């Protein structure tokens, strides 16, 4: 029996909450909190008739530590699931520390204002020392490790699909399939079609910042950075088909490089259609992806936030998206002295997701792992004081839960490799 506070009520949060309500013997009580309480109320009203989980709602500004503390102290949850924006990771972690509550999220911290002088100085120092220049990394949250250890609390970072399940796949491969792993290629393919010329499948602001950043990968323990979208490969994905994919910087590369230091190379690829890339490049060229505030008719606006307001809400894409996603990891290495390859992945159908929880597969593949990660924490499978990423825990019960609750794994012991 557990009480959980979920902060956020967007597409991913809605899936995670819906899945929590399917496991009422563990998630006995849920409080859904967001800046817009009416969204929480609507979701609660939709779910309440079909679950034994007791659902309440609350309004909270996740940028305000005191508001968060007031809510946490009032509700007294066993766990806070942060499924809000990554800009708010640190304030929510601060509140959890102040109130003595375990924490989890689905994406690592990044700043909302990348022109803030204090943040900029730290960022530029990190770029020189680490060797990559994407705006998001784990250093801010890893800095909380001792605080959580001293408090006897667990913080689980990045428990979506990628990051999240992909790291569990890596831990599983290291535990069961290999004696030594030489290379890891993480492949994220969305073969869905929503019918729009341009739309993003999750938060547009976060998505566009991610894909317009310089790409990077880890080789022999060091970062190699490349211009954005400059390395392209083709791959034939199971149940999706041949797709173009591009090398991106992604946060799990950083944690995997730290926790699996003997791996010689770690890369991340994501598929994109030509229409998406053409639109993104045009928007970038005219300044619409900028995070720097500008003055327009006497009002300050941030271009990328204005663009977000114009684009379709990712939560609205569910009923019109058809096709499948395929996300997984390809490994090379050795087992019992012999060369070996291995591919573990999940295929998810957009329309099946919509039938079950009213969501497209992008939100589903992030929301289900969030629920399963919370399940691991609440049942005692994943608990140790400190700040951790998914690969630092036992992958077996987590992958079993994913198999059970909607994201079953597939395996290929002779996959085509990415050159």
Regions found by a protein language model. Give the residues of each.
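Conserved N-terminal Rossmann-fold NAD(P)-binding element of oxidoreductases
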Residues: 4-11
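Residues forming the Rossmann-fold NAD(P)(H) cofactor-binding site
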Residues: 14
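Short beta-strand element of Class I
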Residues: 29-31
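Helix N-cap at the beta1-alpha1 junction of Rossmann-like dinucleotide-binding domains, i.e.
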Residues: 36-39
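Rossmann-fold cofactor-recognition segment
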Residues: 50-64
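Conserved Rossmann-fold cofactor-binding substructure of NAD(P)-dependent oxidoreductases
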Residues: 61-77, 84, 88
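Glycine-/Pro-rich loop/turn segments that contact NAD(P) or position catalytic residues
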Residues: 86-89, 93-202
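C-terminal catalytic/substrate-binding lobe primarily of soluble NAD(P)-dependent oxidoreductases
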Residues: 175-419
């Amino acid at each position: 029996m557990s009480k959980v506070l979920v902060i956020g009520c967007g597409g991913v949060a809605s899936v995670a909450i819906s899945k929590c309500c399917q496991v009422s013997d563990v998630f006995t009580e849920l409080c859904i909190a967001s800046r817009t309480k009416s969204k929480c109320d609507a979701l609660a009203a939709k779910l309440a008739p079909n679950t034994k989980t007791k659902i309440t709602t609350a309004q909270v500004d996740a940028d305000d530590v005191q508001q968060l503390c007031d809510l946490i102290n009032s509700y007294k949850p066993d766990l806070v699931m942060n499924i809000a924006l990554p800009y708010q990771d640190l304030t929510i972690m601060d509140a959890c520390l102040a109130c003595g509550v375990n924490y989890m999220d689905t994406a690592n911290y990044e700043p909302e204002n990348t022109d803030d002088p204090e943040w900029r100085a730290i960022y530029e120092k990190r770029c020189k020392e680490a060797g990559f220049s994407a705006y998001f990394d784990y250093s801010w949250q890893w800095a909380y490790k001792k605080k959580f250890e001293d408090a006897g609390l667990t913080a689980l970072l990045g428990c979506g699909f990628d990051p999240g399940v992909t790291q569990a796949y890596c831990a599983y491969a290291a535990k069961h399939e290999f004696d030594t792993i030489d290379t890891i290629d993480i492949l994220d393919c969305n073969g869905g079609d929503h019918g729009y010329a341009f739309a993003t499948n999750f938060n547009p602001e976060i998505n566009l910042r991610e894909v317009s950043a310089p790409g990077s990968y880890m080789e022999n323990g060091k970062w190699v950075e490349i211009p954005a979208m400059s390395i392209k490969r083709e791959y034939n994905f199971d149940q999706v088909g041949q797709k173009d994919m591009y090398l991106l910087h992604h946060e799990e590369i950083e944690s995997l490089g730290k926790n699996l230091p003997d791996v010689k190379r770690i890369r991340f690829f994501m598929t994109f259609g030509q229409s998406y890339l053409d639109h993104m490049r045009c928007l970038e060229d005219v300044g619409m992806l900028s995070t720097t505030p500008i003055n327009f008719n006497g009002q300050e606006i941030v271009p990328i936030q204005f663009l977000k307001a114009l684009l379709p809400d990712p939560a609205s894409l569910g009923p019109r998206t058809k096709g499948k996603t395929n996300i997984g990891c390809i490994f090379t290495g050795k087992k019992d002295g012999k060369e070996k390859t291995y591919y573990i992945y999940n295929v998810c159908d957009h329309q099946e997701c919509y039938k079950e929880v009213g969501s497209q597969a992008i939100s589903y593949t992030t929301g289900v792992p969030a629920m399963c990660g919370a399940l691991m924490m609440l049942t005692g499978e994943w608990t140790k004081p400190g700040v951790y990423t998914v690969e630092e825990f036992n992958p077996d019960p987590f992958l079993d839960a994913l198999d059970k609750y909607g994201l079953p794994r597939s395996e290929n012991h002779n996959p085509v490799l990415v050159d």
